[in-house]
Amino acid sequence: MTKSNETERMEESEETHSSDIRSASESDHASGSDHTESADEIPTADAEQGELEQLEKLKDDLARERAAFHNFRMARAKQAEIERDRTRSEVIRVILPVLDDFARIEKHSTLDDPFKAVVTKLRSAMEKIGLTAFGNPGDPFNPELHEALFQNPSPDVQTETVQDVIEAGYCLGETVIRAAKVVVQVPNG
């Protein structure tokens, strides 16, 4: 073989060898690419799991915030109701002396018809907002509802009893606005 033939053969052999190497490399690269895709899928699954956990945490946070806001609204509504009752009580306390004066006039004399109509309307208006009077002669004495101004010993009673009402007591719903001022009969003894 001549040198040139030998050189050509070597070059062909090298080209074939290079071609085989490229082919193998491409084949490895292709199979590596498949391997890389499955490796990419694993982080994607982990990422999805992380996103799901984060989403669950956000849902929990949202539920807590909603509950906190609901509790805030309920507390605010209750506070507003307490404030309304307090304001209503203050207004009623200002009007009570007028009702007391009318009650005294009725007790000791008669009201003219126009004044009687005004008193009736005023009492009706107070009842509409929930104001009720209490304290009648013969009622058992209750220190939570009655303020004893005088005590009269009496053999006729077994327990402390309201003998006379000086000023009626008033309740707004369940709340005592003013205790009734009374004279109490107490058992002798």
From Swiss-Prot:
Coarse class of the protein's main subcellular location: cytoplasm
Any GO BP: protein folding
UniProt GO molecular function: adenyl-nucleotide exchange factor activity; protein homodimerization activity; protein-folding chaperone binding; unfolded protein binding
Top-rank taxon, per record: Bacteria
Entry GO CC: cytoplasm
Residue ranges of the region described as Disordered: 1-54
Protein location: Cytoplasm
Record CDD domains: GrpE
Coiled coil segments of this chain: none
Keywords: Chaperone, Cytoplasm, Stress response
Composition skew (Basic and acidic residues), residue ranges: 1-38
Signal peptide: none
Pfam families per the UniProt record, alphabetical: GrpE
Function: Participates actively in the response to hyperosmotic and heat shock by preventing the aggregation of stress-denatured proteins, in association with DnaK and GrpE. It is the nucleotide exchange factor for DnaK and may function as a thermosensor. Unfolded proteins bind initially to DnaJ; upon interaction with the DnaJ-bound protein, DnaK hydrolyzes its bound ATP, resulting in the formation of a stable complex. GrpE releases ADP from DnaK; ATP binding to DnaK triggers the release of the substrate protein, thus completing the reaction cycle.
Quaternary organization: Homodimer.
Family the entry assigns: Belongs to the GrpE family.
Protein name per Swiss-Prot or TrEMBL: Protein GrpE
Source organism of the structure: Tropheryma whipplei (strain Twist) (Whipple's bacillus)
Source organism phylogeny: Bacteria, Bacillati, Actinomycetota, Actinomycetes, Micrococcales
Name of the encoding gene: grpE
